[in-house]
Amino acid sequence: MKKKIWKSSASIEDLIKRSNIISNIRLFFSKKNILEVETPILSRSTVTDVHLTSFETNYISSDNIDELKLWLTTSPEYHMKRLLASESGSIYQICHSFRNKEIGRYHNPEFTMLEWYQPFCSMKKFIKEIDIFLQIILKCNKSDKVSYQDLFIDFLKIDPLCTNLLELHQISKKLKLDHLTHSENNLNKLIQLLFTLKIEPNIGKEKPLFVYHFPAEQASLAAINLKDPRISERFEIFFKGIELGNGFYELIDVNEQKKRFIRDNKERRSMNLPTRKIDNFFLSALSYGLPPCSGVAIGLDRLIMLILNKKSIHEVIAFPVDRC
């Protein structure tokens, strides 16, 4: 019988449950007096991150003369940080974000994200706050915490902070991954590949796991650790072998942030990817003064998928890309 692809891929019963979960999330933040905000999903700039591909469109003036290139946001991060610089205090947002070239069991080009920022909050304290959130919403046990370095030592018997190409190629061959790694000579890319294929699917099985202090090369928009410049103040959350969230003790140094954007575009050129215009509104906010803060982005579709014991986020979204 032909599939009724006009229908929702999620059952109405599950969509009601989804709505209730999101209501409970809003209640959690309301009780903590954290402000819910709304920011644009269209932006004049986009991210420079080489791992993200943005959707673009054009605004056309009514006389059809002027065009303005706009981007669908991959996350609300830059706009929310501009609010933080405007002294918003603690804020959160539940919104749709958009990432091209992403489809699969845990991916849809349009997805729902929870983004949350706490000014004057250390990474360690913020992880405790998120842990409480997960216990309430997921109804799970208290999470575990482990450093990125210790995770590699436990699983692969190598130290990612002082390894070398020879050692990484040897372990890749031992793990029968050499068909993927034999031509790769970028240390950081090899480390990320090993993490994704051999560690990530096997962690957080019984309860959520926070992996913190990612290598400095993977800092993204996180600050570098003051005591050890080899590591960043970045963490990720895993549960049942799935990445649920990505967080930082945020970088607030405008000059360092600009250097990272430039470095991203340099890497884009080397990979034959289009360079991206740097978001000067965001840099101006950093220059004005972003308060010391921690933030996290959590994939709500994945979170709801786990709560409802589904195997794909497409089972908790009404109309994923194949039905939209």
UniProtKB/Swiss-Prot annotation:
One of its GO terms (biological process) is lysyl-tRNA aminoacylation. GO terms for molecular function: acid-ammonia (or amide) ligase activity; ATP binding; lysine-tRNA ligase activity; tRNA binding. GO terms for cellular component: cytosol. It catalyses: D-beta-lysine + L-lysyl-[protein] + ATP = N(6)-((3R)-3,6-diaminohexanoyl)-L-lysyl-[protein] + AMP + diphosphate + H(+). SUPFAM superfamilies: Class II aaRS and biotin synthetases (SSF55681). ATP binds at R99, N100, K101, N108, E243, L244, G299. Its EC number is 6.3.2.-. Pfam families: tRNA-synt_2. Substrate binds at S75, P76, E77, Y117, E250. Keywords: ATP-binding, Ligase, Nucleotide-binding. With EpmB is involved in the beta-lysylation step of the post-translational modification of translation elongation factor P (EF-P). Catalyzes the ATP-dependent activation of (R)-beta-lysine produced by EpmB, forming a lysyl-adenylate, from which the beta-lysyl moiety is then transferred to the epsilon-amino group of a conserved specific lysine residue in EF-P. PANTHER family: ELONGATION FACTOR P--(R)-BETA-LYSINE LIGASE, LYSYL-TRNA SYNTHETASE. Belongs to the class-II aminoacyl-tRNA synthetase family. EpmA subfamily. Homodimer. This is Elongation factor P--(R)-beta-lysine ligase. It comes from Buchnera aphidicola subsp. Acyrthosiphon pisum (strain APS) (Acyrthosiphon pisum symbiotic bacterium). The lineage of its organism: Bacteria, Pseudomonadati, Pseudomonadota, Gammaproteobacteria, Enterobacterales.
